A protein has these predicted regions:
Chain B
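Eukaryotic intrinsically disordered and solvent-exposed regulatory patches
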Residues: 34-36, 92-94
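Residue-level recognition of beta-strand->loop/alpha-helix junctions
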Residues: 81-86
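Structural signal for hydrophobic/aromatic residues that build the beta-strand cores
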Residues: 49, 70, 80, 104-107, ...
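Thiol/disulfide oxidoreductase modules built on the thioredoxin-like
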Residues: 97-102
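Local sequence-structure signature of Cys/Sec-based thiol-disulfide redox active-site neighborhoods
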Residues: 38-78
Length: 110, 150
């Protein structure tokens, strides 16, 4: 049997993309990644009894909206966009974020 | 600012509205007593980490990674305190509201909220974390034994 890659087209992932589009309309102009890492954490203490295959996500996003903001402020922007999904018992359990401005991304890429 | 003040989808869904209400109640749930207990914890050492599990036995990969980073930086154990949120549901929920940060671990240095695992990882990479901890005088002192001239 082939192992199925964790999909990023489940309902939670789709909601994430929708929310990001509202909050950061420019993110599609830049490099972007949404990763579902739930399989790496299957059944560990924090998600026992949570059968959802969409508990652990990783987002790599670039937006001009991050300009002039420190990292915790950038994280809070994304957290507050997704606060409903994170507050639910069966919702997002962990969210890894890499949030850069276009300039930061460019200078890293070179 | 970036979040529309009024989300029409929300107001049409009674389920979502109930959830919002519930969250609001959670927000009220942080009593002065718990707030004070959290403040005491934050003041208990220059470097304070709220984590899942203990430094010896972390119960979550992100808590483990953060402990590892602080150890690599050479944080002085005497200046460090860790609190296991899994032992106390009031702390676990309370700290999220207190810091306005929805995930664990959470790092405080000199009573100031620094961030979670991603923020700390990125600060470690850029050298900011070392600067911050040095400024807070939270690192193990360099070998001073041979220069006892004072």
């Amino acid at each position: 049997m082939f192992k199925r890659a964790m999909s990023t087209d489940g309902p939670v992932a789709r909601t994430i993309l929708k929310r990001l589009e509202c909050g950061f309309p420019d993110y599609k102009n830049f490099a972007f990644g949404l990763y579902n890492d739930s399989h790496k954490h299957k059944g560990h203490a924090g998600v026992q009894g949570n059968a959802s295959a969409e508990t652990h996500f990783r987002i790599e996003m670039v937006s001009k909206k991050f300009e002039g903001l420190k990292l915790p402020q950038r994280h809070r922007m994304v957290y507050s966009l997704l606060q409903d999904e994170m507050a639910q018992a069966n919702g997002i359990h962990a969210l890894q974020l890499s949030l850069k401005t276009p300039q930061e991304y460019e200078s890293k890429a070179k | 600012m970036f979040l529309p003040k009024f989300n029409p989808i929300r107001s049409f869904s009674p389920i979502l509205r109930a959830k919002t209400l519930l969250r609001y109640q959670n927000r009220m749930y942080l009593s002065t007593e718990i707030r004070r207990a959290i403040e005491d914890a934050i003041e208990s050492a220059p470097v304070v980490l709220f984590m899942k599990g203990t430094p010896e036995f972390p119960k979550c990969g992100f808590s483990r990674a953060t402990i590892g980073l602080l150890g690599n930086q050479g944080v002085d154990p005497a200046k460090f305190a860790a609190y296991n949120v899994l032992e106390d549901p009031e702390l676990r929920e309370g700290i999220k509201e207190f810091s306005e940060w929805p995930t664990i671990p959470q790092l405080y240095v000199n009573k100031e909220f620094i961030g979670g695992c991603d923020v700390i990882t990125s600060m470690a990479r850029s050298g900011e974390l070392a600067d911050l901890l040095e400024e807070a005088q939270a690192l193990v002192p360099e070998e001073e034994e041979e220069t006892k001239d004072r």
